[in-house]
Amino acid sequence: MVMSDPIADLLTRIRNANVVRHEVVEVPSSNIKKAIANIMLTEGYIRNLEEYRDGSVDMLRITMKYGQNKERIITGLKRISKPGLRVYCRKDETPKVLNGLGVAVVSTSKGIVTDREARKLGVGGEVLCYIW
């Protein structure tokens, strides 16, 4: 099956697992998905990320992170730039999510980075998603 929006699929799988408090989510791997998951790992939204091969398909195993008493660390995930409507920002228009409490994932010429890194590098790009 061909997916029209693999990034939205990744975010939806993580959102659904978060709602029912699953420990592990498995998604088909790609470079963009890996970069977004790595940002989630470094920002502290997920516990672990590993890549493995299932037959002929590369997969990502994402271990979800919860607080004490299983409260959710991820309160929201939102896809911003979609295949039907791309959203771009200039270097001086990089969005802040919840006044800096959340993270905007931006695809730039320097790679896929957070909004803070994009401001530091002085680059703009396509705003992929918000995580808070």
UniProtKB/Swiss-Prot annotation:
Molecular function, one GO term: rRNA binding
Protein name: Small ribosomal subunit protein uS8
Keywords, in A-Z order: Ribonucleoprotein, Ribosomal protein, RNA-binding, rRNA-binding
Organism: Clostridium botulinum (strain Okra / Type B1)
GO biological process: translation
Domain of life, source organism: Bacteria
GO cellular component, one term: ribonucleoprotein complex
Disulfide-bond pairs as recorded: none
Known function: One of the primary rRNA binding proteins, it binds directly to 16S rRNA central domain where it helps coordinate assembly of the platform of the 30S subunit.
Chain ranges passing through the membrane: none
